[in-house]
Amino acid sequence: MLNIFFGITVSVFIAAVTLHTVGTFKDIRILKNISKPFLIFSILISHALIIVSYLPDSSLLLIYGSLALFFALAGSTLFMLKDKTFKIIAVPFFILSIISKLLVTFPSFRLYRFPILVSILFAVLYATGAAVPFLIFIKKKSAIISAAYAVMILSIGTYTYSAVLSFFGELRIYTIFLFMDSLSMVFAAFVKAKKETEELSSPLLDFISIMACTASQIFFAAGSVMMQAL
């Protein structure tokens, strides 16, 4: 079942990125607009994968995970509407989604015997990283820059430490997937922040940031499948 969801995620992402790429380089606004709902849908599917893989461990994780998905879906739907009022209302939903993901991530990594410090860092990283794909579409420079540097700092320390601890253990492959996920998120956020701060208008930068965001979610979904298989 997880493999099916993973296949759906990758397929939808490929379709969305194709539409976005063609729309960007050909300056076809409707294609760029169509691609955004597909990308958000794929993000939600990939987030659902890791929650499903934790189901045998704790019903509490299912509750937190379901809340995270609900708030993310509600926030995404509101944010896609043209009225600025709806975009403002969407912000609290994104915050609640991030908090819910923080709650589901921390006990999950504790279940797999990560040291307490690593568990906290992982949880904070994913709480921050969960917002990055959505921030790709937001024009607020301060929010993008904050997300870019927060993910960068947290990922370097957290993933380096955890990779060393688990390299010879059963979580080696899973950690590699998460490490690649983190690097992709960092790269996407950094490119977006650089573009906004320097006020660059380049279809190539748009393409690079959306591809990095795509890679991040695919690695995230793949890591979820690997965790379920362990």
Describe the function of each predicted region.
Residues 1-230:
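Polytopic alpha-helical membrane-helix bundles and their juxtamembrane interface segments
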